[in-house]
Structures are given as structure tokens and as C-alpha cells.
Curated annotation (Swiss-Prot):
Subunit structure: Homohexamer. The hexameric complex has a two-ring architecture resembling a top hat that caps the 20S proteasome core at one or both ends. Upon ATP-binding, the C-terminus of PAN interacts with the alpha-rings of the proteasome core by binding to the intersubunit pockets.
Function: ATPase which is responsible for recognizing, binding, unfolding and translocation of substrate proteins into the archaeal 20S proteasome core particle. Is essential for opening the gate of the 20S proteasome via an interaction with its C-terminus, thereby allowing substrate entry and access to the site of proteolysis. Thus, the C-termini of the proteasomal ATPase function like a 'key in a lock' to induce gate opening and therefore regulate proteolysis.
Protein name listed in UniProt: Proteasome-activating nucleotidase
Record's keyword annotation contains Oxidoreductase: no
Gene: pan
Annotated residues for binding of ATP: 183-188, 322
Family: Belongs to the AAA ATPase family.
Length: 398
């Protein structure tokens, strides 16, 4: 390329031409760097694809169980329902993670341990974990101050301040059993505790642990506690525990024997975990009279908390909580609390909801005393029915 090609006359100074060449050189250098960067990126992508292709071409591995570690390089493994082998351990396997009972991948040719597999769990057990923290707080519970204090001392305090128990020299409670009539706030207390404590909350209903085939219920209980240990700190909440914790009888059917196996596994798991650890268990029932005595002894459920029907003061607190966002006009909550003797917390919530529905039915934006009177009649029924409910609760719960 000459001076004439770029339009510069021979008589002109060569400085402009030199500046043009320098600018052109910078442009070419920039293009070279861009192409080199693209080349490196494509080489990395090619390397990744080759590695992926190499992995896909590898033969499948056997799944087995680690039985025993012999030394740093050898172990005894067992293929599922097969013989046992003394095999080598691949150098890239972290030895501290190899424990008896762990699931491992075995090479097809040499049977060497080439990978540590995650523990096997039933999908239903994984579904017990509550991902979203409940929105219920302690302020949403009325009339249960004493019960909340006992629950927080037994569950929340050991998780947040374990050093207090070490200084005093005692072991914290392993578990808490909440018992009382239906609708009195047992499940609500557990939800509030999960909201306040920064821990994994695992909720399961007792009937979900009852299975048709032999050994399935016991396996679910074992995997439930294994999940809690992996997710620690964790709280296991078993609602309606009487479904698996009823008293064992001498004469049983096949289904009852399976329930008894599930109960025995639960007892074994509760005996097995450390009370000073980060796993706590809460259970709830409205039939404490039918629970197996082995479940209630100290060392399993160390604290039994009764959640009774609310008295007048408690009913007034519950009504204030449920009506704090309602537009009331001329409503005396003390009268409502006096008229609802024998009602549970769930009944009181239903009464406030029905009172609001009566106001909406009349196209009003406020709730009156008359609305509450109608709601009491609808929810609790006649005085005779109400007295029958009170008598039934007294017979059942004393």
C-alpha cells in the first residue's frame, strides 16, 4: 500500500501517513485479541463437550453398600442381594465420608469404589419437610401463655442456647407431647415455634406413617429421623400420634402388627438420638388415654403439656386476636366470652368468621352484637347441645 493509495500527496508530510498506519495497527491488534478470546472460549467449550462425551461413553456402575472399611485403600462392599467383595477405593474419594451403610458406586470391571452416592430416601419422606416458614407467631396464640413457656423451654431454648444446659449440668428434654381436646391450639403452637426458631420444620401426620406392607412404616420412621439429622437443626412434629402410638394388645391382626412395628421403630429412634443434639421432636394428640406407656416414659417425651379448653380469660384473649382486624360496632367481647363456655379456640375462630358472614349477608361493612349471637347459635347449637359437649369433654379429659 502506497501513499497514493490512501490519498496522501507526495508533497505532504509523512506524519499523517504514519498516524494512519498506527491506527490501523491498533485496529488489527484489537481484532487479533478478539479472535484469540473467541478461540480460547471455543477450545474450552470443545474440551467440555469432549469430557461430557467421555462420561456418556463410560459403562454404567453397580450400586452397592459399604459394609466395612479395612484400611485407607480397601473396603468390604456388597452388591444389592449379592455377594460381598473386598475392593479398592479410588484415590479421589474422601475417606471421612465413607461410613458403614453408605451407598457407593462400583466399577463394573474392578468393583472398585468410584463414587459416593446420596442416601436413599422415600420421596414421601422428603415431602414432609416444610420449605416455607409458617406465618403464625406467638402473638397469634391467646390464652396459652403457660403452655407456650413450657414448649419454648423444652424445644426453643436448647436449640438457641445449649450452653445454658451445659452450665447447669442437665440434659435438655428430647421431646414434648401436646395433648388436649381438638381445636385448642396444639398444631398452632408447633407452627408458631417453627416460625420463631431458625430450624428445619418437618411435619408428618401419624396416619401417613401407617403402610400396607411389612416394614414400610418402620423404614419411613427411620428415614424421617435420618432426614432430620441431615437437616439439623431440625424439629420433627408428629400430629395425631395416636395413629401409630396406641397401646399394644396381645391379640392383634396383621395390620395392627404392622402399626406396632412402626411404633417400636419410633421408640428405637427416640432412644437413639442425643438429647443435646440439634434434633427435637414434638407430638400432638387428643387421645392421651390410648397412648402406649412406653411412649410416655421420661427419656422419650420428657415433657407432657396439656392444652385444655380455654377459660373465660383465655376465650377473651382469643376473641381479641380474631377480631383485631374486624370492623366492630357495639360489640361487647366479654359477653361473647361468657356465652361461649366450653368452646375451643377453633370454635371461637369459627364464630368470628360466621359473625362476619352475617354482616356481609346484610350488606353491612361492620359487625354487630346480634351477628355474634347468631354465629354462636350456628356454631355451638342450642344450650342443650353445648352442655352435652362440655359433659363429654369432662368425661374424656377429666
Amino acid at each position: 500500500m502506497s501513499i497514493e493509495d490512501v490519498g496522501i500527496k507526495p508533497s505532504e508530510e509523512y506524519d499523517d501517513y504514519i498516524m494512519y498506519l498506527k491506527k490501523r495497527i491498533r485496529q488489527l491488534e484489537l481484532q487479533v485479541r478478539t479472535l484469540e478470546a473467541d478461540k480460547e472460549r471455543l477450545e474450552r467449550e470443545l474440551s467440555r463437550l469432549r469430557m461430557e462425551m467421555s462420561r456418556l461413553r463410560q459403562p454404567p456402575a453397580f450400586a452397592g453398600t459399604l459394609i466395612e472399611l479395612l484400611d485407607e485403600d480397601r473396603a468390604i462392599v456388597q452388591n444389592y442381594n449379592g455377594p460381598r467383595f473386598v475392593v479398592r477405593i479410588a484415590p479421589w474419594i474422601e475417606r471421612e465420608n465413607l461410613k458403614p451403610g453408605a451407598r457407593v458406586a462400583l466399577d463394573q470391571r474392578t468393583m472398585a469404589i468410584v463414587e459416593l452416592l446420596p442416601s436413599e430416601k422415600d420421596p414421601s419422606v422428603l415431602g414432609f419437610e416444610v420449605i416455607e416458614r409458617p406465618t403464625v407467631s406467638y402473638n397469634d396464640i391467646g390464652g396459652l401463655d403457660k403452655q407456650l413457656q413450657e414448649l419454648r423451654e423444652a424445644i426453643e431454648l436448647p436449640l438457641k442456647h445449649p450452653e445454658l444446659f451445659e452450665k447447669v449440668g442437665i440434659e435438655p428434654p428430647k421431646g414434648v407431647l401436646l395433648y388436649g381436646p381438638p381445636g385448642c391450639g396444639k398444631t398452632l403452637m408447633a407452627k408458631a415455634l417453627a416460625h420463631e426458631v431458625n430450624a428445619t420444620f418437618i411435619r408428618v401426620v401419624g396416619s401417613e406413617l401407617v403402610r400396607k406392607f411389612i416394614g414400610e412404616g418402620a423404614r419411613l420412621v427411620h428415614e424421617l429421623f435420618e432426614l432430620a439429622k441431615e437437616k439439623a437443626p431440625a424439629i420433627i412434629f408428629i400430629d395425631e400420634i395416636d395413629a401409630i402410638g396406641a397401646k399394644r394388645m396381645d391379640e392383634t391382626t396383621g395390620g395392627e402388627r404392622e402399626v406396632n412395628r412402626t411404633l417400636m421403630q419410633l421408640l428405637a429412634e427416640m432412644d437413639g438420638f442425643d438429647p443435646s443434639g440439634n434434633v427435637k421432636i414434638i407430638a400432638a394428640t387428643n387421645r392421651p388415654d390410648i397412648l402406649d406407656p412406653a411412649l410416655l416414659r421420661p427419656g422419650r417425651f420428657d415433657r407432657l403439656i396439656e392444652v385444655p379448653l380455654p377459660n373465660f380469660k383465655s376465650r377473651l384473649e382469643i376473641l381479641k386476636i380474631h377480631t383485631k382486624r374486624m370492623n366492630l360496632k357495639g360489640v361487647d367481647l366479654r359477653i361473647i366470652a361468657e356465652m361461649t363456655e366450653g368452646a375451643s379456640g377453633a370454635d371461637l375462630k369459627a364464630i368470628t368468621m360466621e359473625a362476619g358472614m352475617f354482616a356481609i349477608r346484610d350488606r353491612r361493612e361492620y359487625v354487630t352484637q346480634e351477628d355474634f349471637l347468631k354465629a354462636i347459635e350456628k356454631v355451638l347449637g342450642s344450650e342443650q347441645r353445648l352442655s352435652q359437649q362440655i359433659a363429654m369433654h369432662e368425661v374424656m379429659y377429666g
